[in-house]
Each structure stands twice: as C-alpha cells, then as structure tokens.
Amino acid sequence: MKKKRTLQNNLSYALKYMFGNYGINIFLDSKKFIVTLDNLIPNLQEETNLVKFAIQKNAISAIVNAYDQRDIDKNFAYLRAKTILTKNGVSEKATTYLLDCFLYAFDWID
C-alpha cells in the first residue's frame, strides 16, 4: 500500500502550505523559513538539508525573486537555480525534485 501524502511527509505540500499561509515573504527570511519548515516536516531531514544547501548557494533566492515576474524570467530563474545546484554537486534528480517542489508551491506548475 502506498503511503498517503500529508503535510508532514511531503516537501511540496509543506512549501505550498507555507506559501498559502505566509505568502512569498516567508521565503525571503531564510531563518524564519527554515524554522517553519523544520516544524512542518521534522521527519524529512534529507529534504530539509537539501533546502538548506540550496538556500546557502542562493538557488532558492533565484526562484523566489522571479515569483511575480514574466514566464520567461521564471524559466530563466529555474535554469539558473538548476545550474547552481548541479554545479555544486547536487544530482540532477534531487535538483529537479527540489525545484519542482518550489514550482508547485508557487503555483507555477500543477
């Protein structure tokens, strides 16, 4: 039987919850963002560590700063974030997963 996805066991749901309840500003304050994320998904340490690494390398800020921009700028931000992460040793699979979680949270994808 497949494990049911809930807020507590799914990064994309947690990010979407944060965006829906706190808006884009929660992602601009990295300390508040990480504390909130740790509280929402305490059992997803691997995902949380990946988010922290992406914040440290400014990959997340590339996506966040493009939030209210044109689609072309969003696409550029996605590619920039992807390049940052892969050049810093994050696998293609993990990079795609992480960025897709943020895109889902921001309603850029379904």
Task: State what each model feature region is.
Residues M1-D110:
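Charged, amphipathic alpha-helical regulatory modules used
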